[in-house]
Each structure stands twice: as structure tokens, then as C-alpha cells.
């Protein structure tokens, strides 16, 4: 496969290669367990091996690629047990900070506006983006909503924990890719959650957050099962 790249200012080539490999994994052009040879990839993308190696190391930190001693790198296999644990921690984190988020949204309406704008972008994304670009952009916006939610708690350490978890959540998202109908369902759930937070209904917000995480869990499990990845 030949890739055409525009001229890159210094410092951007690694980012470009990183994005390309990430999209290839999302589109299953690079499959779970597939060996990643830096020389082969350099020829494939018509670049030197240095940015390839740097991009792969970055993907290792995100949980998309793994390095096996004496065997090299490969697209990381992900287990259902790991995904389940991540989602359990996400639920605990989200529920714990509901009251803080409600308080801060009330005191800082611009936070609610940022969350709402993210939902609007998610909706627009459904009509504008296809294939791997669609999956990557959908992930980015979904992640942004949850990131803003945790940030709205005002707890910087909680945000650090979220970011640490999130490096692996991306893996579960792309390996459990979902059709647009399910993505739209998730967007509606975001809308409903935000509505209850703005209205200050703590109990209802907790109920909707629990449903949202549970639905995500079920969708990912079903997708992995259908793809024989369980």
C-alpha cells in the first residue's frame, strides 16, 4: 500500500505516522496479534524507520501495540476481563463525582456549554465521517465528553486517573466497534445525562450513568463475541 503525504513541518511526521497506524488498526487493516515490522511499515508508508519506531512506541503507551521480548512488536490482543475491569473503574469514578459535577456546572455554566457542544459535534460526526476516520473521530468526541465530565468535578487527580484508564479504553473501543445506530444511542444517553446534571437531579444522573456504562459494556462484549475475539 502506498501512502501520499504532504510536506511536513519539523516535528509532525511522527504524529502523522501515529495517526495512520492508529487508523489502520481501527479499520482492521492491521489485525490483533499481527506482527509489526518497522522496516516493512517504513516501506509501506514511504518514510524512514525512525518515525515508525517512535509512533509504535507511542502506541505501546496507549495499549494498541505491545512489544514481545525477542519477538518484536505486534498489534495488541485485548481480553474481555481487562475491558470489564476498566469499565467497572470508569463507573465507580463517574458515580463518585456526580454531586461535585452538578455543583460545578451550576457555578460555571460554561462547563455545561462545553459538554453540550461536544454532543453537538458527536451528532454532526455521524453524517460527515465514514470508515476509520469516522471511528477515530467518534472516539475522540466520546472521550472528550467523559473527559470534560471528570474535569467538571474539579478534582485534578481524578482526571489523571481517567487519562491513565483511557489509554486502554481506546483499545476496547476500536476492537468493539459499533454501528452508527449504537453510536447515536450513546449520544442520546450523553444528552440525557447532561440534562439531569444541569437540572441537579443527582439520583437520576447516577441511574443514567449506570445504564450508559452498562450499555457500552454489552455492546463491546457482543462485538468481540461476533468477531471471535472472546
Predicted regions and their residues:
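Short linear motifs at protein or domain termini
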Residues: 1-103, 225-230
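C-terminal effector-binding regulatory domain of bacterial HTH transcription factors
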Residues: 1-7, 203-230
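Short helix-capping and inter-helix turn/linker motifs at the boundaries of alpha-helical repeat units
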Residues: 12, 183-184
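Acidic/polar helix N-cap motif
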Residues: 79, 199-201
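Short alpha-helical functional segments enriched in proximate histidine and acidic residues
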Residues: 100, 148, 152, 219
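Conserved amphipathic alpha-helical segments that form helical-bundle/coiled-coil interaction surfaces
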Residues: 109-175, 187-195, 204-214
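Solvent-exposed loop and edge beta-strand segments that line ligand/cofactor-binding
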Residues: 178-182
Amino acid at each position: 500500500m502506498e501512502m501520499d503525504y504532504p510536506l511536513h513541518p519539523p516535528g509532525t511526521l511522527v504524529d502523522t505516522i501515529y495517526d495512520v497506524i492508529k487508523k489502520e488498526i481501527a479499520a482492521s487493516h492491521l489485525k490483533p496479534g499481527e506482527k509489526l515490522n518497522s522496516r516493512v511499515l517504513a516501506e509501506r508508508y514511504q518514510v524512514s524507520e525512525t518515525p515508525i519506531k517512535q509512533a509504535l512506541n507511542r502506541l505501546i503507551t496507549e495499549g494498541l501495540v505491545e512489544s514481545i521480548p525477542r519477538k518484536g512488536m505486534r498489534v495488541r490482543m485485548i481480553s474481555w476481563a481487562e475491558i470489564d475491569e476498566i469499565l467497572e473503574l470508569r463507573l465507580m469514578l463517574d458515580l463518585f463525582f456526580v454531586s461535585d459535577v452538578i455543583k460545578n456546572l451550576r457555578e460555571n455554566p460554561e462547563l455545561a456549554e462545553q459538554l453540550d457542544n461536544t454532543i453537538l459535534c458527536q451528532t454532526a460526526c455521524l453524517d460527515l465521517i465514514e470508515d476509520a476516520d469516522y471511528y477515530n473521530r467518534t472516539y475522540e468526541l466520546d472521550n472528550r465528553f467523559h473527559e470534560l465530565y471528570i474535569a467538571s468535578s474539579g478534582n485534578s487527580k481524578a482526571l489523571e486517573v481517567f487519562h491513565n484508564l483511557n489509554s486502554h479504553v481506546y483499545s476496547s473501543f476500536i476492537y468493539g466497534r459499533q454501528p452508527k445506530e449504537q453510536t447515536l444511542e450513546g449520544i442520546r444517553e450523553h444528552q440525557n445525562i447532561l440534562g439531569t446534571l444541569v437540572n441537579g437531579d443527582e439520583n437520576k444522573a447516577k441511574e443514567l450513568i449506570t445504564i450508559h456504562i452498562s450499555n457500552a459494556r454489552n455492546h463491546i462484549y457482543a462485538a468481540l463475541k461476533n468477531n471471535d475475539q472472546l
